[in-house]
């Protein structure tokens, strides 16, 4: 699967320590949190996951858990290029506590993370080799400093028979992404686990399917695509005629 995250965490204190102490999350408590964070959406319970896998659920599914002091939400819908565009009601829900957003996608080497304290943004970073630095707000955290200082330059292996080109960024976003995930949430996706890391394989998340009453769920999207194909009709084939103009054929 690669390193992919769409993760939102609310906490009253140190997230890694709170997750280390987390037991089984109450389903009713978690469902109440879901209704608060997804107002006006249809919410149906489904099979859950563990934290290590639940940070990147299938489309239309959210994996979540709520404990006293800490709440976790895994949702692809949180994967936004600019963390400052996180919906206001999600930021408002962090009043009096810390909010961490962590997004990562290994296919495009993209990383975005942000931290709010009591609803106030203190740090936001989003970057990828294709788009460069899209957002960089606030003072870097200590775990970032070696990267910005040039001590963690990207080590990219070129394809065979291709010349090596300089990596567009001073470091690899996914390497910083793993360090950010560990520092902010206590675990990693693909890095080497450390002794005091949170065991994300042992933390269960409840599953929920999210439906927009005014939008399109997976079934509606499939039907819409089928309808588009029917509207387009069968393929039409053309060849060049003797006069050099396109002439429609019955097929090939």
Predicted regions and their residues:
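Short, extreme N-terminal segment that most often corresponds to the first beta-strand
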Residues: 1-33, 247-252
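Structured loops at beta-to-helix junctions and adjacent beta-edge loops in soluble globular domains
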Residues: 11-13, 75-76, 208
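Short loop/turn segments at secondary-structure transitions that flank enzyme active sites
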Residues: 14-16, 79, 130-131
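Generic detector of well-ordered alpha-helical segments enriched in charged/polar residues
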Residues: 16-20, 31, 35, 87-91, ...
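Generic surface-pattern signal
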Residues: 20, 24, 39, 95, ...
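Short, intrinsically disordered low-complexity segments
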Residues: 28-126
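Long, compositionally biased intrinsically disordered terminal regions
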Residues: 103-104, 110, 118-252
């Amino acid at each position: 699967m690669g390193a992919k995250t769409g993760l939102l965490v609310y906490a009253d204190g140190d997230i890694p320590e709170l997750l280390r102490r987390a037991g089984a999350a109450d389903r009713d408590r978690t469902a109440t949190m879901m209704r608060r964070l997804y107002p006006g959406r249809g919410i149906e319970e489904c099979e859950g996951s563990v934290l290590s896998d639940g940070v990147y659920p299938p489309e239309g599914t959210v994996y979540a858990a709520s404990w006293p002091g800490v709440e976790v939400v895994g949702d692809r819908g949180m994967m936004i290029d600019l963390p400052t565009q996180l919906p206001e009601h999600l930021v408002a829900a962090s009043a009096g506590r810390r909010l961490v957003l962590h997004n990562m996608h290994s296919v495009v080497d993209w990383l975005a993370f942000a931290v709010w304290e009591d609803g106030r943004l203190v740090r936001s970073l989003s970057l990828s080799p294709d788009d460069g630095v899209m957002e960089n707000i606030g003072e870097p955290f200590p775990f970032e400093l070696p990267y910005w200082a040039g001590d963690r330059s990207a080590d990219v292996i070129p394809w065979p028979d291709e010349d090596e080109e300089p990596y567009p960024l001073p470091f690899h976003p996914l390497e910083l992404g793993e360090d950010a995930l560990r520092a902010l949430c206590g675990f990693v996706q693909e890095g080497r686990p450390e002794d005091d890391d949170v065991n994300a394989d042992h933390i269960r998340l409840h599953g929920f399917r999210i439906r927009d009453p005014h939008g399109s769920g997976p079934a509606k999207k499939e039907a819409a695509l089928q309808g588009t194909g029917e509207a387009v009709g069968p393929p039409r084939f053309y060849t060049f005629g003797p006069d050099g103009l396109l002439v429609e054929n019955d097929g090939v």
